[in-house]
C-alpha cells in the first residue's frame, strides 16, 4: 500500500524522492519539484485539487518516456522512476524552475507542456498518447529527441543512436547475459554538442568494437576485478574519465592526447592510460589531469605505447570535488616501464594534493640546467610532494600550506619558493646540513630534517636562511644528539617522534644571544599510543644564554583525534640550562613530563597555565613562581621548597581530579619564615621530612584537601595555621617511598576559638610492617580529634599503624575506618 504524504494547508514546496509515496497537497498554492534526486525505479504519485499549484521540472531532468491522458500524465525518468500527476490539467508546468535555488523557469499549461513533449493535442476519455522519447530539460526549455541533450540507456539488443546539438549521454554495461548492453554491433553517433559514453565494466573488459563517433568524453568504471578498455583509435575523444572505479583500470588505444579525470576512485586502485600512434608527441606536449577525492595509495600512469620514447612533458593537475586528493605516484612515461618524459608538473585547485612517491623528471642533472619544475602557484589547498634526488628541481608553492621533500637530493642548483602559507622543505639521509651550502630557499618557514641512522643530526647556518622553524625527526638510532646552535632570534624548534627510539642530548642556541630577553620555543610532537612512555622522550635539553624557554606539548597527528594521555606523554628527562634561564612557559593539549636541572639557578617562573592536559614537573632549584594548568598536575620540588616559592592552580578544581605537590624538607621554620608556604588551589600536598625538624605554616595554603606527611627518619614536623576542613595525612603520600611516617607530628588550627573545632588525621599506611609509628600532638583548645584509618590496615596482612595519642589534648577522640576483618 502506498504511503500518503500530506502537505499543510499553507503554501508548500514538496520535493518528491521516495518510492511508493503519494504526495498530496491541501488548500495552499503548492509547488512540486521534479529532479534527478528521485530514487531510481521509484513509483510516485502527485494529487492536488485545491489552490494554484505547479510542477517544476528542474534543469537537467531527463525523461525517457511519457504518456498523456486528458487530465493525467505519466513521466518515466531516465533512471526508471515513474511519476504520475493526477489532475494534471489543474497544474502549471514550470520548465527549468526551482524554488529551492530561486531559479525561475518558463510556465506552460498542461496542453502546452504536452505539445512540448511531442503530443500535439491531448486525448479525450481514457485514451493514452505517448510523448517523444528521451526528452531533457535544458535551462528553461524542454526539447525532444536525443539531440536535445538526453540520457540514453543502451539495451541488450541492437542500438543505433544518433545525437543532435545537445550534450548527450549514452550509458552502457559490459556485463553478462541481460546486463550486457554495450554490444559490438551497436552504433553511437553523438552528433553535435559535448557528448559522453558512460561505460561500466562490471563483468568484463571493453575491446573497442562498438562503433562510436562524435563522442568527446569516454567515462569508464572498473568494478568486480581489474579491467581494461581498448578504444581502438576512437577519434574525437577529448576527455577520459575514470568514474568511481573500485578496481584497477587500464585504458589504451587513444590516438591523441586527452584530458584525464579521476572521479572518486577507490583508494589503492590504479589508473593507467596508454596513448597510441602519437607521432604528435613532442616538445611541450601537455595533459590536464583532474583529481576528485583520489586515494592515497592509488597509482596514476600516463604513458606512450610500446617503443615510444617521447611522451607527456607538461602535466597540469587540478584538485576538484569535495575533498583532498592523494596518489602513491603520478608518472608520465615514454612507454610502459620506460623513462620519465616529464619536465613540468603544475597543480591548481582549492583542495590539497598529496603524492607520496617523488615526482620523476626526464633526464638527470647536468650542471646548473633545470631538469624539472613543480609549480603549485595556482593551488590554494596546499600540496605535499617529493622531488627525485639527482635532478635540478625548481619548486614554486601557492597560497596554501605546501611541503616538498627533497630527501638527500637538495643541492645548490635546486630551489624552493614556498609562496604564501606556512611551507615546509624536508631533507633526510645526512648527518649534517649547512644551509649556506644548499640550494635557494625563500618564502618557506619550516625545515624538517631526519639524520642518517647511527649518528646525530646537526643543522648549521640557520642564521643565513629565511626559515623560522627547524623540525628534527628522530632517526632509528637511540639517544642520538640533535644540534642547532646558531638560530636566529624568533626561530623555533620541533622534535618529531616516530619510532621506539628517542633523541639523546638536544643542544639549541642562538647565533646572537647577547640580549637580556632572548627566547626560544620548542615544540614536542609525540606519538600517540607509543610503545613505551620513554619513546616520546628527550634525554637532555641543553640550552645556553636563553632567558625564556617556551615548551609546547603536541602530538604527531595522522587521524585527527590523537592525544597523549595518562599513560603517554612528551618527556624531557633533564633541562640543562645556565644561569640565564629565568622563565619556562609550557602549553599544549598533550601530557608533558619534564625535569629542570640544578644548573638553572636563576629560574624564577614556571608558567604552565597554557597546558590543558596533565603535567609532571620536577624542580631542582628554588624561589620559583609556578602556575599550573587545567589538567591533573604533579609538581615535584625535591628539596627546594620554601616560602620563596609560590604555586597557583590554573583552574582544575573538580571533585574527581586533583593536583599534587611533593617536597622533601629539612629545617624549615615558621620563625625565620622559610616554612610559610604559598600554595593556592592544589588539592594534595605531600611533605617528606628528613635530617632536621621543620615547622610549616598553612596560613597561605588555600584550596587544599590534604597535607600528607611521610618520613622514616623519626624527624618531627609541626604544621601551624591549618584551615578548618584540611585533612592531615599520616603516611598517606602518593609516592611509595613516602607512604609511611615515624616521628612526632604537631598540628594546630588557624582558628581554635570555636566550640566544635576538629582536626582529622588520615592514616594511609600501604607499605610494610608498622609503617606508621607516630606521636600526635594537638592543643587543648581543639574539641575533637578524628583519626581515620584506611581500609588496608589489618594486622593479619602485616600492615598496621601504631599511634601515641597521649599528647592529643582534645576532649573527644574519634577513631574509625580500618579493615573490616581486623578486630582488637
Model-flagged regions — what are they?
Residues 1-824:
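Solvent-exposed, low-complexity segments and loops of surface/extracellular structural proteins
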Amino acid at each position: 500500500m502506498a504511503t500518503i504524504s500530506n502537505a499543510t494547508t499553507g503554501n508548500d514546496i514538496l520535493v518528491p524522492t521516495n518510492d511508493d509515496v503519494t504526495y498530496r497537497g491541501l488548500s495552499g498554492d503548492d509547488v512540486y519539484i521534479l529532479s534527478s534526486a528521485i530514487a531510481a525505479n521509484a513509483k510516485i504519485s502527485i494529487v492536488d485539487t485545491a489552490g494554484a499549484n505547479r510542477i517544476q521540472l528542474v534543469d537537467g531532468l531527463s525523461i525517457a518516456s511519457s504518456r498523456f491522458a486528458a487530465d493525467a500524465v505519466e513521466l518515466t525518468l531516465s533512471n526508471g522512476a515513474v511519476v504520475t500527476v493526477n489532475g494534471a490539467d489543474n497544474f502549471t508546468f514550470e520548465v527549468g524552475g526551482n524554488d529551492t535555488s530561486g531559479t525561475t523557469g518558463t510556465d506552460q499549461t498542461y496542453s502546452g507542456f504536452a505539445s512540448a513533449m511531442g503530443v500535439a493535442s491531448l486525448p479525450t476519455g481514457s485514451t493514452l498518447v505517448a510523448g517523444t522519447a528521451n526528452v531533457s530539460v535544458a535551462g528553461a526549455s524542454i526539447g525532444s529527441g536525443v539531440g536535445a541533450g538526453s540520457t540514453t540507456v543502451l539495451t541488450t539488443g541492437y542500438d543505433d543512436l544518433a545525437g543532435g546539438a545537445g550534450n548527450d549521454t549514452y550509458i552502457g554495461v559490459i556485463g553478462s547475459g541481460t546486463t550486457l548492453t554495450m554490444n559490438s554491433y551497436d552504433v553511437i553517433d553523438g552528433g553535435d554538442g559535448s557528448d559522453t559514453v558512460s561505460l561500466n565494466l562490471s563483468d568484463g573488459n571493453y575491446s573497442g568494437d562498438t562503433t562510436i563517433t562524435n563522442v568527446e568524453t569516454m567515462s569508464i568504471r572498473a568494478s568486480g576485478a581489474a579491467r581494461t578498455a581498448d578504444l581502438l583509435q576512437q577519434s574525437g575523444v577529448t576527455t577520459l574519465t575514470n568514474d568511481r572505479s573500485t578496481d584497477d583500470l587500464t585504458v589504451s588505444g587513444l590516438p591523441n592526447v586527452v584530458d584525464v579525470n579521476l572521479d572518486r576512485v577507490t583508494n589503492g586502485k590504479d589508473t593507467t592510460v596508454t596513448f597510441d600512434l602519437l607521432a604528435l608527441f613532442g616538445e611541450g606536449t601537455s595533459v590536464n589531469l583532474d583529481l576528485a577525492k583520489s586515494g592515497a595509495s592509488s597509482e596514476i600512469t600516463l604513458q606512450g605505447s610500446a617503443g615510444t620514447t617521447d611522451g607527456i612533458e607538461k602535466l597540469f593537475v587540478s584538485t576538484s570535488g569535495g575533498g583532498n586528493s592523494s596518489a602513491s605516484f603520478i608518472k608520465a612515461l615514454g612507454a610502459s616501464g620506460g623513462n620519465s618524459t616529464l619536465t613540468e608538473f603544475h597543480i591548481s585547485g582549492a583542495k590539497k594534493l598529496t603524492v607520496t612517491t617523488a615526482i620523476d623528471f626526464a633526464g638527470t642533472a647536468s650542471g646548473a640546467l633545470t631538469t624539472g619544475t613543480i609549480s603549485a602557484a595556482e593551488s590554494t589547498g596546499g600540496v605535499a610532494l617529493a622531488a627525485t634526488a639527482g635532478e635540478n628541481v625548481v619548486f614554486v608553492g601557492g597560497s596554501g600550506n605546501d611541503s616538498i621533500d627533497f630527501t638527500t637530493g637538495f643541492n645548490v642548483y635546486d630551489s624552493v619558493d614556498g609562496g604564501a602559507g606556512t611551507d615546509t622543505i624536508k631533507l633526510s639521509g645526512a648527518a649534517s646540513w649547512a644551509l649556506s651550502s644548499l640550494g635557494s630557499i625563500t618564502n618557506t618557514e619550516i625545515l624538517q630534517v631526519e639524520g642518517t641512522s647511527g649518528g646525530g643530526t646537526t643543522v648549521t647556518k640557520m642564521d643565513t636562511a629565511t626559515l623560522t622553524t627547524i623540525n628534527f625527526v628522530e632517526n632509528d638510532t637511540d639517544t642520538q644528539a640533535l644540534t642547532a646552535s646558531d638560530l636566529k632570534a624568533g626561530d623555533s624548534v620541533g622534535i618529531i617522534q616516530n619510532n621506539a627510539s628517542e633523541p639523546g642530548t638536544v643542544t639549541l642556541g642562538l647565533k646572537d644571544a647577547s640580549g637580556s630577553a632572548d627566547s626560544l620555543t620548542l615544540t614536542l610532537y609525540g606519538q600517540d599510543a607509543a610503545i613505551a612512555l620513554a619513546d616520546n622522550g628527550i634525554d637532555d635539553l641543553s640550552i645556553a644564554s636563553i632567558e625564556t624557554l617556551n615548551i609546547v606539548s603536541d602530538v604527531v597527528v595522522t587521524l585527527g583525534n590523537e592525544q597523549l594521555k595518562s599513560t603517554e606523554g612528551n618527556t624531557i628527562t633533564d633541562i640543562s640550562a645556565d644561569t640565564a634561564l629565568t622563565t619556562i612557559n609550557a602549553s599544549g593539549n598533550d601530557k608533558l613530563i619534564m625535569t629542570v636541572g640544578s644548573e638553572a639557578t636563576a629560574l624564577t617562573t614556571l608558567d604552565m597555565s597554557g597546558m590543558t592536559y596533565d603535567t609532571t614537573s620536577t624542580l631542582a632549584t628554588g624561589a620559583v613562581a609556578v602556575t599550573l594548568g587545567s589538567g591533573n598536575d604533579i609538581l615535584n620540588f625535591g628539596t627546594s621548597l620554601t616560602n620563596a616559592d609560590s604555586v597557583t592552580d590554573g583552574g582544575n578544581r573538580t571533585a574527581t581530579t586533583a593536583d599534587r605537590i611533593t617536597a622533601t624538607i629539612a629545617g624549615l621554620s615558621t620563625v625565620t619564615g622559610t616554612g610559610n608556604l604559598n600554595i593556592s588551589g592544589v588539592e594534595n600536598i605531600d611533605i617528606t621530612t628528613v635530617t632536621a625538624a621543620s615547622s610549616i605554616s598553612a596560613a597561605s595554603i588555600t584550596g587544599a584537601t590534604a597535607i600528607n606527611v611521610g618520613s622514616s627518619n623519626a624527624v618531627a614536623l609541626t604544621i601551624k595555621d591549618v584551615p578548618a576542613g584540611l585533612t592531615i595525612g599520616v603516611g598517606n603520600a602518593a609516592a611509595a617511598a613516602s607512604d609511611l611516617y615515624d616521628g612526632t607530628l604537631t598540628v594546630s588550627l588557624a582558628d581554635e576559638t570555636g566550640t566544635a573545632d576538629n582536626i582529622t588525621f588520615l592514616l594511609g599506611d600501604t607499605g610494610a610492617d608498622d609503617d606508621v609509628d607516630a606521636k600526635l600532638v594537638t592543643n587543648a583548645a581543639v574539641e575533637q580529634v578524628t583519626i581515620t584509618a584506611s581500609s588496608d590496615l589489618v594486622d593479619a596482612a602485616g600492615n598496621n599503624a601504631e599511634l601515641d595519642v597521649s599528647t592529643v589534648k582534645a576532649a573527644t577522640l574519634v577513631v574509625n575506618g580500618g579493615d573490616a576483618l581486623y578486630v582488637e
